[in-house]
């Protein structure tokens, strides 16, 4: 599936990079630039800030758009990309049949209606972590990010709604075998969009990746 392919591609050799000594490393790079770090170092360089949800509504992020005007919105594009048995595609991108795997809870799903497409870093969490200061266009780009396979993932509605807007300090996927992958993907999305972490989130990430393979996290900055 898309996420596994992306992580496999990230095992290429990394250039040496000296980590900053101060607590808040600041911006990680320019839009279009790249950065690759071992997972545990990637956690260290995420910018630090306290969270704020003042002014947030879900409509602050225009999502499920059809950027390429092919009749399939972002949700449908993810479902088509992640199906391991392709669904039939009808008028207006109506999907029937097909089969998917939900890694959050280790469940196979044979109907698109049983799936949610989850933002790896939820919209509310993104707002808390800096997106509240972005332009409407940047928030729309974030909510429909098909440029990185880790940003959006098809999972069971039940597991997605259990997660809601929580970060890894309070929620991890029920499937323990997927947790290290989940943490790596979470960090990658935060890096890609240069989203901040608060103290509790960084501590939780640090503690939880301690038992994970220290594999590289490679991103292209979206902003």
List the model feature ranges, each with a label:
Residues 52, 68, 74-75, 113, ...:
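Glycine-rich, flexible loop/turn motifs
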Residues 1-24:
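Secretory targeting and sorting signals
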Residues 11, 77, 125-129:
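Active-site-proximal flexible loops/turns
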């Amino acid at each position: 599936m898309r996420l596994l392919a992306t992580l496999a591609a990230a095992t290429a050799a990394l250039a040496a990079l000296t980590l900053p000594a101060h607590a808040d490393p600041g911006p990680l790079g320019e839009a279009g630039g790249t950065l690759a770090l071992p997972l545990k170092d990637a956690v260290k360089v995420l910018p630090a800030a306290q969270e704020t949800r003042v002014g947030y509504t879900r409509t602050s992020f225009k999502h499920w758009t059809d950027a390429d005007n092919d009749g399939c919105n972002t949700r449908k594009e993810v479902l088509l990309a992640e199906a391991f048995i392709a669904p039939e595609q009808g008028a207006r991108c109506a999907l029937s049949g097909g089969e998917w795997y939900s890694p959050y809870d280790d469940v196979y799903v044979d109907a698109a209606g049983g799936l949610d497409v989850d933002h790896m870093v939820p919209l509310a969490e993104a707002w808390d972590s800096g997106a509240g200061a972005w332009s409407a266009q940047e928030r729309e780009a974030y909510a429909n990010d098909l440029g990185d396979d880790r940003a959006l993932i098809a999972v069971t509605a039940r597991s997605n709604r259990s997660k809601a807007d929580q970060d890894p300090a309070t929620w991890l996927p029920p499937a323990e075998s997927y947790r290290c992958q989940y943490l790596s993907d979470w960090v990658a999305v935060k890096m890609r969009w240069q989203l901040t972490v608060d103290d509790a989130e960084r501590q939780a990430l640090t503690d939880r990746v301690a038992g994970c393979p220290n594999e590289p996290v490679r991103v292209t900055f979206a902003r």
